[in-house]
Amino acid sequence: MQLNIPTWLTLFRVVLIPFFVLAFYLPFVWAPMVCAIIFVFAAATDWFDGFLARRWKQTTRFGAFLDPVADKVMVAVALVLVAEHYHSWWITLPAATMIAREIIISSLREWMAEIGKRSSVAVSWVGKVKTMAQMGSLVGLLWRPDHNVELASFVLLYIAAVLTFWSMFQYLNAAWSDLLEP
């Protein structure tokens, strides 16, 4: 297998995860900003690798597998770190909801692909808006430069949580008849 630039970008995103975690725990005033910058950079590679793969016609099976895995791991790690930092149910609850949704939908997509109906659970616009709200909230909650950014990030986190439920129910609804078949 020959790796192309989009796949290298996806692999780079995976490699950034331990550095992102390390930056989170560094005992320096600038550590939250560095952590947020690494997260933003990783999130940007998520968009860029897909863009390049489509534009250069370099989509691969490995890239199609690795890209969503890298995304989910990056976001799940960020949500766990944020929940740990705030150590509060009102942050942990939406974080756990979002992680659970990712596991449920990933499993649903895999199952639908096995029965030949992968397109029934394609990514929706609600999922894309959820991702934008989620990324925005995580950047703010990782960085925490001031109280206003933190408050705006809390609001975005809850918007992302609501959209998480909405998109999850859309996916489940699209697959419902297949799920109920004997």
Swiss-Prot record:
Subcellular location, principal? membrane
What the entry lists under PANTHER family is as follows:
CDP-DIACYLGLYCEROL--GLYCEROL-3-PHOSPHATE 3-PHOSPHATIDYLTRANSFERASE 1, CHLOROPLASTIC (PTHR14269:SF62), CDP-DIACYLGLYCEROL--GLYCEROL-3-PHOSPHATE 3-PHOSPHATIDYLTRANSFERASE-RELATED (PTHR14269)
The reaction(s) this protein catalyses: a CDP-1,2-diacyl-sn-glycerol + sn-glycerol 3-phosphate = a 1,2-diacyl-sn-glycero-3-phospho-(1'-sn-glycero-3'-phosphate) + CMP + H(+)
Q: Which residues lie on this side of the membrane: Cytoplasmic?
A: 1-12, 82-86, 169-181
Q: Which gene encodes it?
A: pgsA
Q: In which pathway does it act?
A: Phospholipid metabolism; phosphatidylglycerol biosynthesis; phosphatidylglycerol from CDP-diacylglycerol: step 1/2
Provide Periplasmic-side residue ranges. Answer: 38-60, 108-145
Q: What is its EC number?
A: 2.7.8.5
Task: List all membrane-crossing ranges.
Answer: 13-37, 61-81, 87-107, 146-168
By what name is this protein known? Answer: CDP-diacylglycerol--glycerol-3-phosphate 3-phosphatidyltransferase
The UniProt keyword set, sorted, is: Cell inner membrane, Cell membrane, Lipid biosynthesis, Lipid metabolism, Membrane, Phospholipid biosynthesis, Phospholipid metabolism, Transferase, Transmembrane, Transmembrane helix
Q: What does this protein do?
A: Catalyzes the conversion of cytidine diphosphate diacylglycerol (CDP-DG) and glycerol 3-phosphate into phosphatidylglycerol. Essential for the synthesis of anionic phospholipids, thereby playing a role in balancing the ratio of zwitterionic and anionic phospholipids, which is thought to be important for normal membrane function.
Q: Name one GO cellular component term.
A: plasma membrane
Alphabetized NCBIfam families for the sequence: pgsA, PRK10832.1
Q: How does it sit in the membrane?
A: Multi-pass membrane protein
Write out the GO biological process terms. Answer: glycerophospholipid biosynthetic process; phosphatidylglycerol biosynthetic process
Instruction: Please verify whether the record's keywords include Hydrolase.
Output: no
Q: Which domain of life does this protein belong to? A: Bacteria
Subcellular location per UniProt equals: Cell inner membrane
The record's family statement is: Belongs to the CDP-alcohol phosphatidyltransferase class-I family.
Show the Gene3D superfamilies listed in the entry: 1.20.120.1760
Q: Which GO terms describe its molecular function?
A: CDP-diacylglycerol-glycerol-3-phosphate 3-phosphatidyltransferase activity
